[in-house]
């Protein structure tokens, strides 16, 4: 049977963690390995994990940031597929993991499975689907138009998974998805919403740093001219 490694990264996330844990606990699919990588929280995050997901594999220690913690999650995973579900985000339905596994089992096992994402607020009120929508046949070059698949709806075969690049502090997930698409031989879409993603804005300073990082990542993967043309296109779309 296919085993799915669900990985949650948290640090003092007591206020947002409950929906995440409950969504994992209610999954009907039995072959789930749940890994929680905690950055030595000082609140009740770990008590919540232990009470709602008692079978979770917990690591709690200081780290060098989000992507360092995600690398720890990859190292600890033993499942066939890796799926990151951050604190505050939740699986859409109790059958969501089962639906992903059924998609994997349709033919040869894909390297990447992906789906759609619903944006929710802190009250779990739906704000709408992401503006960038996943295409039916996802390819690396599609990410020139932005991150078309939310990281939490991007399920990767462990056999191709590489560590996150810690030289990026805000956009390493974008770089990681590009590198996974580069290594993937087959990507398969699940034509449904997989994840409820908790909306949260970056500060202006972090927002601009994130944009600069993303430009550098795009240039590295696609070259300078395609990256410039893509950003001109972004500006045109925003002004329409």
Give the positions of each predicted feature:
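Short aromatic/hydrophobic "clamp" motif used to bind/position activated sugar donors
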Residues: 82
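Conserved donor NDP-sugar-binding/catalytic core segment of glycosyltransferases
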Residues: 94-127
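Acidic helix N-cap motif at the loop->helix transition within catalytic regions
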Residues: 15-18, 43-51
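A conserved acidic beta->alpha catalytic loop
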Residues: 30, 38-47, 86
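Glycine-rich, basic loop-to-helix element that forms the pyrophosphate-binding segment
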Residues: 60-77
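Short, acidic, metal-binding catalytic loop of nucleotide-sugar glycosyltransferases
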Residues: 22-31
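Cell-envelope/extracellular polymer assembly enzymes that use nucleotide-activated donors
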Residues: 2-5, 33, 175
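Conserved nucleotide-sugar donor-binding catalytic segment
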Residues: 129-213
């Amino acid at each position: 049977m296919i085993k799915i490694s669900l990985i949650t990264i948290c640090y003092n996330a007591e206020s947002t963690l409950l929906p995440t844990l409950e969504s994992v606990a209610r999954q009907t699919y039995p072959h789930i390995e749940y890994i929680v990588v905690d950055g030595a929280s000082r609140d009740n995050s770990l008590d919540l994990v232990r009470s709602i997901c008692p079978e979770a594999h917990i690591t709690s220690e200081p780290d060098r940031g989000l992507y360092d913690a995600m690398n720890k999650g990859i190292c600890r995973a033993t499942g066939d597929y890796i799926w990151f579900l951050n604190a505050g985000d939740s699986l859409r339905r109790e059958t969501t993991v089962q639906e992903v596994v059924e998609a994997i089992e349709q033919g040869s096992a894909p390297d990447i499975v992906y789906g759609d994402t619903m944006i929710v607020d802190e009250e779990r009120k739906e704000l709408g689907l992401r503006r960038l929508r996943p295409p039916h046949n996802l390819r690396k070059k599609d990410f020139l138009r932005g991150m078309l698949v939310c990281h939490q709806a991007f399920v990767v075969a462990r056999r191709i998974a590489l560590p996150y690049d810690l030289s990026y502090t805000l956009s390493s997930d974008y770089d990681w998805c590009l590198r996974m698409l580069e290594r993937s031989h087959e990507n398969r879409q699940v034509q449904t919403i997989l994840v409820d993603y908790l909306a949260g804005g970056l500060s202006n300073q972090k927002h601009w740093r994130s944009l600069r990082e993303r430009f550098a990542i795009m240039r590295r993967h696609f070259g300078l001219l395609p990256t410039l043309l893509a950003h001109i296109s972004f500006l045109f779309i925003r002004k329409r």
